[in-house]
């Protein structure tokens, strides 16, 4: 036994319990905590006591923490900061909710209509306070609500309102309604008109077995073909539904022989009028307009619009008038109802309308005619409801027959032409004549169309989206083997003119076909008969060496279509007397108002180059659409420009609001004067497929100041029927592309010298050249106008006085600068009377 054990066993035997003092302590504080051994540490063997900590010094006691009060300064600052943060979050949230509800949401209005076939019309439906009207309105509104509250636009749908319930010529009820959506402005771009209309149309369940257009819309029998839904204006919604009904009136007409007047006028304030016209079932409405007094601004503010419905639905527009007129015009509906809206929100002078409407029966446009056996015209055919504008979707059928196989049928039109139909379709009616397709187009002269057959079937299908101009033609028979009389020339227009008028320098055929493929006559300068060569006499060009062809040109002679007429009705032979710098008329009228191109000596050129110098072409204008250069134009007065009609073709481009004119500009973006465009006047006969009548006038909102006359000047308008000679040098200018393959236009104004091309060569190259066009360029293809130059000037300098003449307007061509394909320009001299109609100050 070791020493330690021996000491314990050797305890005194007299030891008593009373001698032992016991100290009780907390076991939790004093007892050692049993912890697992650390890695690598050996546990004590069983039966062996663990080593004891030496008992020498007692462990010092921990000092107890001092209790700190909760509401001290530091905690108060923290709590106050948290409170301010929470308050700021709440304020920003409320502000965001307010803005999102008030400023960031827009209302979208849609006007529509459809026909319910299983409900018969009752007279009580005309009274909007009647139980019958309220009942059917409630039913329709519930159906529309169900359609859109279960659609993808459900969270944006606001309400639907039935505006009118009317009869119609197809039976049942024709319901007109508004649908209103409200959505955040940021999402407005995804809200499409076609999407809204598709939801309504797709909700109509049609039967495949019955193959009918009538289907079920939540229990309503709706004609699918009658469904129309277009985006509308808030002002139209307010004036037809809301409290701002203005001068809205409802007319129900049931007497055929009466004229129901529509007259309203005001000298100040505003006019926002809606006239709802309804006729008895089975009849149509004809509106006749005597006069309109409005501000001419392309219907931006003032307008008169005629609808084939009782709500202002865009796709049901029959016609829109944007200019004042005193010429009688009449329009016919396709159903027994019509809406006429007159708007003049800012009346500066007297505005108003004088018109009347009447109830007329439907007409069938068909006839069978047995033509006489003698040649000549004997009767007339016309468009439906002539002389009214004929409605869209009309159809006419005529059958002509002659008893002789040697005779064919001829149609003589007064302002219309029929040509072979192309792949592009027809804008003003398509014709099927003996199973051949043709297109119709309007023009300002007569044409004759011949069918070499004794039996002719003709069908006219009205293809215009709007009501179109009245159409009148004479019919008769002709000799198939000899269409024109002996001694006559047959024009490409179908007309017959005396052979003596061929190649006489006068456009007798109206299409210049009598002046093509002519050998230029040489004047007999040394004989007394040289006066018979009219085109070469007094034309401003010296054809005789002795100048005899240009002598005695201002001697008074009887007036004809080749003479110049002074203000006092005196005529002489001089062809281009207007504004040539020489006073030829006794009253000086030939030089009145000639302020164009006054500073020609100040013009600088870089011959052979491409860039111009600043002020080089002071009549050149850059037209910007929505801020970007789009077309060119020419200054012809202080507030009028001349350009090409194709620059403004279409609904968006014809609106003057997005257009601005940049004058006195050399580098794009550095114009000396910029003005919004107030008005765009496109020629009424413009043909977007052939580019015929490709001319337009633009009126500036602000006239350019006289202080800029060194950098901005009008170019001279040519005299009516001005003759030009092939090979004459002219200049085409613009900011268009330098090459056909370029992606963008030039920043610096470009110029190119071109030659006028012989009209016969021009027609031979393109084939579809009219007398209102001319060709210019270089046949090698080195110089030409290009994309972006459209509407810009073709400027030619007159030798007699050095003034610059606006000979042409950049119109079209085959590519740009291609060999053997010169550019095609609008011949301005053919439109001088049309220009004077709108700009009389140039007279």
Swiss-Prot record:
UniProt entry keywords in alphabetical sequence: Cell membrane, Disulfide bond, Glycoprotein, Hydrolase, Membrane, Protease, Repeat, Serine protease, Signal-anchor, Transmembrane, Transmembrane helix, Zymogen
For this chain, the annotated S-S bridges are 247-273, 299-322, 365-396, 484-496, 491-509, 503-518, 525-544, 538-553, 559-571, 566-585, 579-594, 631-647, 730-796, 762-775
What is the top-level taxon of the source organism?
Eukaryota
- GO terms for cellular component: plasma membrane
- Domain (SEA): residue spans on this chain: 106-234
Organs and tissues of expression:
Expressed in brain, ovary, testis, salivary gland, trachea and lung.
Gene Ontology terms for molecular function: serine-type endopeptidase activity; serine-type peptidase activity
Membrane-related topology note:
Single-pass type II membrane protein
Annotated region (Disordered) at: 27-67
Name assigned to this protein: Transmembrane protease serine 7
Cellular localisation? Cell membrane
Gene giving rise to this polypeptide: TMPRSS7
Q: Which residues lie on this side of the membrane: Extracellular?
A: 98-843
- Report quaternary structure and partners: Forms a heterodimer with SERPINA5.
